[in-house]
Amino acid sequence: MFIRILGSAAGGGFPQWNCNCANCAGLRAGTLNAKARTQSSIAISDNGVDWILCNASPDIRAQLESFPALQPARAPRDTAIGAIVLLDSQIDHTTGLLTLREGCPHEVWCTEMVHQDLTTGFPLFNMLEHWNGGLKWNPIALSGNFSIPCCPNLHITPIPLRSSAPPYSPHRNDPHPGDNIGLLIEDRNTGGTLFYAPGLGQVSEELLATMRRADCLLVDGTLWRDDEMLVREVGTKLGSEMGHLQQSGPGGMIEVLDGMPAVRKILIHINNTNPILDEDSVEREILGEHGIEVAYDGMNIEL
């Protein structure tokens, strides 16, 4: 299995256009040892030729241009993207579908709840239906697994996660299974297994059992501490209120990952305020001591 990190930041990217926190200001000034990052999205493939896009970031055009494998140029109009899988209906995971409209029709895989949001509160399916057939919905059931024709050797198991629908959703305050999912992806040729969950707010015993099956964990790295947005004076909500498990402290992501046998443990969807973006920070050093990596745009993983 080939995995390309197209974008590794949380919503807004890094630096965020209107943010002057220490990280964003430091990166702009050239005083911070850090890499700029676009909003999170990955591409996966079983052969390195045909690819599945997992989430469609607002930064998708720049991300596609940065990865030549996604433009094989076999015809006057071409793409190596054979399908798109949406893990949720968040704006920063779906807005890129608008940028991809010239390539319609697209095969889009998502749950019933995500499809509801994207035909009501943020009606992308409706908006794009006049673009050469628009978005073709392939339902993701919350039980069993599925494969996608362009990458038939990748068997994908959806994992329902405990989190909320986006703020715009008609059922924002009425959570349903399928609002957010993680993916357990197994390459039947190599046996390599990836667990991908860029938005992870709570970890149940059942989820821990699933995570233990993976060779590589690519999981939520949004915030170092739950009150990070408040401490940095750039927000009013706790990470837990936004559906993100902090890295530090009892029950945090570091503690969760310490109990995992995976060969690689990688954080993705990193908020611009997170001190782990500073490669010289104490927090980054702590991650290294625990064998935890930090995803960056352009990172390649092979399983």
UniProtKB/Swiss-Prot annotation:
SUPFAM superfamilies: Metallo-hydrolase/oxidoreductase. Pathway: Cofactor biosynthesis; pyrroloquinoline quinone biosynthesis. Pfam families: Lactamase_B_2. GO terms for biological process: pyrroloquinoline quinone biosynthetic process. CDD domains: PQQB-like_MBL-fold. Keywords: PQQ biosynthesis, Transport. The keyword Transport applies. NCBIfam families: PQQ_syn_pqqB (TIGR02108). Belongs to the PqqB family. May be involved in the transport of PQQ or its precursor to the periplasm. PANTHER family: COENZYME PQQ SYNTHESIS PROTEIN B, HYDROLASE C777.06C-RELATED-RELATED. This is Coenzyme PQQ synthesis protein B. The gene is pqqB.
